[in-house]
From Swiss-Prot:
Monomer. Residues 81-84 are annotated as: G3. Its EC number is 3.6.5.3. GO terms for molecular function: GTP binding; GTPase activity; translation elongation factor activity. The gene is tuf. It catalyses: GTP + H2O = GDP + phosphate + H(+). This is Elongation factor Tu. GTP hydrolase that promotes the GTP-dependent binding of aminoacyl-tRNA to the A-site of ribosomes during protein biosynthesis. Its main location: cytoplasm. It is found in: Cytoplasm. Mg(2+) binds at residue 26. The keyword Hydrolase applies.
Length: 395
């Protein structure tokens, strides 16, 4: 059977279902695929097809995630759903499943629960830009006032974590009834997807962002100059562009790209995803090192102090067997290099056990090009013991 051509005319958006255990995330995922399939937007997936998510390994961490896809009139969606709470935590911190926006599922019969709060906090810390709320199981609640109360609670909770709680869409429905084909509830699923279409912004694709390339290797070509190689992480670079060399030093230095090579061929420009060699004007072999980045001037700056959301690998995942405390000094692996850093745990937290997730403050011994949302691994003697994402820059 010939493979279908991927339709690029629609914008592509990554979403996921979040929320407390048993509030109906997987049922909703099944309902969305089923209802949209009736309207020609992909194929229906049954609950048990989604629930038996295969285990994946991302940065040495075991995560179960189900991936489904579906389409609306205007967009193509890739949707992730995780079976267990721990899978969400790991997924969001490692960035295994990128989310451009999330559908927060809250059972109208129970209201917001501890994991509802935790998923919202995590989303803020890892930079999920937008939420649409689905109040599920409304068929089990007869009292209209109670529904309004739950909606207010959810809105307040989102506001507490700096999301626009008063303005974001809240759709009421029943995923199970929609799955069973009850027309009134199928309508609510279409209403939900219309809200997702409208409210979750189309992400700026990597190609459109300011240029950045982590330096993997450096060598000099006699008579031509110094070449930095690496994979372009975002944006594009053209011959003649001015770039900054950032990280591992207090100040960034500027240079001009005088040549771009890929697979031994000369190019006029390179874009996100390309593995290239960039020839740099007036830069000596000693001026640039692995672990630095080439970037569009002014687009990213070097920092040493930041707050981060971190998942600590369990013993079974090959992590530490013992807890760690404040002043723990592991290596932080950013893009292509390790830098030593000191950890400070939040007030009232004495230690962190393997398998926990925690917000911590880090101070690196040398500055690295970082920004909110930059991901890293924590390593000890070459093995990964944690995975994290920068939630805010301190200095």
């Amino acid at each position: 059977m010939a493979k279908e051509k991927f339709d690029r005319s629609k914008s592509h958006v990554n979403v996921g279902t979040l929320g407390h255990v048993d509030h109906g995330k997987t049922t909703l995922t099944a309902a969305i695929t089923t209802v949209l399939a009736k309207h020609g937007g992909g194929e229906a997936r049954a609950y048990d097809q989604i629930d038996g998510a295969p285990e994946e390994r991302e940065r040495g961490i075991t995560i179960s995630t189900a991936h489904v896809e579906y389409e609306t009139e205007t967009r193509h969606y890739a949707h992730v759903d995780c079976p267990g709470h721990a899978d969400y935590v790991k997924n969001m911190i490692t960035g295994a499943a990128q989310m451009d926006g999330a559908i927060l599922v809250v059972s109208a019969a129970d209201g917001p629960m501890p994991q509802t709060r935790e998923h919202i906090l995590l989303s803020r810390n890892v930079g999920v830009p937008a939420f649409v709320v689905f109040l599920n199981k409304t068929d089990m609640v007869d009292d209209e006032e109670l529904l309004e109360l739950v909606e207010m609670e959810v809105r307040d909770l989102l506001t507490e974590y700096d999301f626009p709680g008063d303005d974001l869409p809240v759709i009421k429905g029943s995923a199970l009834k929609a799955l069973e084909g009850v027309a009134e509830y199928e309508e609510r699923i279409l209403e939900l997807m219309a809200a997702v279409d409208e409210y979750i912004p189309t992400p700026e694709r990597d190609k459109e962002k300011p240029f950045m390339m982590p330096v993997e290797d450096v060598f000099s070509i006699t008579g031509r100059g110094t070449v930095a190689t690496g994979r372009v992480e975002r944006g594009e670079v053209k011959v003649g562009d001015e770039v900054e060399i950032i990280g591992l030093a207090e100040d960034a230095s500027k240079t001009t790209v005088t040549g771009v090579e890929m697979f031994r061929k000369l190019l006029d420009y390179a874009e996100a995803g390309d593995n290239i060699g960039a020839l740099l004007r007036g830069v000596s072999r000693e001026d640039i090192n692995r672990g630095q980045v080439l970037a569009k001037p002014g687009s990213i700056t070097p920092h040493t102090n930041f707050k981060a959301e971190v998942y600590v690998l369990s013993k079974e995942e090959g992590g530490r067997h013992t807890p760690f405390f404040s002043n723990y000094r592991p290596q932080f692996y950013f893009r292509t290099t390790d830098v030593t850093g000191v950890i400070e745990l939040p007030e009232g937290t004495e230690m962190v056990m393997p398998g926990d997730n925690i917000e911590m403050t880090v101070e690196l011994i040398s500055p690295i090009a970082i920004e909110d949302g930059t991901r890293f691994s924590i390593r000890e003697g070459g093995r990964t013991v944690g995975s994290g994402v920068v939630s805010s820059i301190q200095k």
